[in-house]
């Protein structure tokens, strides 16, 4: 831990916490800090100008990152008949109905995302106490309850990320890995910001995107000049 602490202290000394860095410089700094022995994730935190306590200002959605996430995703799908076959053909690892529900109840949750056809919600709805706390409960707002299960599976495999504002009004998301080229990370960040703009609540007043900061898994935060994101 001592070496890690010294490394972070040395990096933190390079970062001006009050400065807004242009996106290219911010990405360079964050990638420089990502010197752990594993491929660190590159994460973004976006402070939104909303009141998260108001139900009509909860920002939630999903976006397919053009350069992917760098993570392989296991997908489970609740579907039957033709839709079940379509889900399997699209690459879903687990497809079922009552049998899949029993697997979930038994604690066998070896998947990262759950997708459901609308006609299966009578079964899926009974699993809320298990799937909900794990962030796995299908929801139409993020595209995981849909009649087009094949496209949903393909999106999940292609690098779709879900986002939801927390109680402090902040969106947290991963936009790639330290091994990604800066151009890939930049395009992913642009896609996320575009999705957040489209999800802006009608009742949100004033500045909507207030602060943007980047960091690696083991690194420190680097604030980003939003104008440099818009300029890409």
UniProtKB/Swiss-Prot annotation:
Coiled coil regions, renumbered to chain: none
Keyword Plastid applies: no
Gene3D superfamilies assigned to the protein according to its UniProt record, in alphabetical order: 3.30.190.20, 3.40.50.790
Any one GO BP annotation for this protein: translation
GO cellular component, one term: cytosolic large ribosomal subunit
Keyword terms, alphabetized: Repressor, Ribonucleoprotein, Ribosomal protein, RNA-binding, rRNA-binding, Translation regulation, tRNA-binding
Molecular function via GO: rRNA binding; structural constituent of ribosome; tRNA binding
Complexes and interactors: Part of the 50S ribosomal subunit.
General function of this protein: Binds directly to 23S rRNA. The L1 stalk is quite mobile in the ribosome, and is involved in E site tRNA release.
Protein family per UniProt: Belongs to the universal ribosomal protein uL1 family.
Designated name of the protein: Large ribosomal subunit protein uL1
Organism: Paraburkholderia phytofirmans (strain DSM 17436 / LMG 22146 / PsJN)
Gene designation: rplA
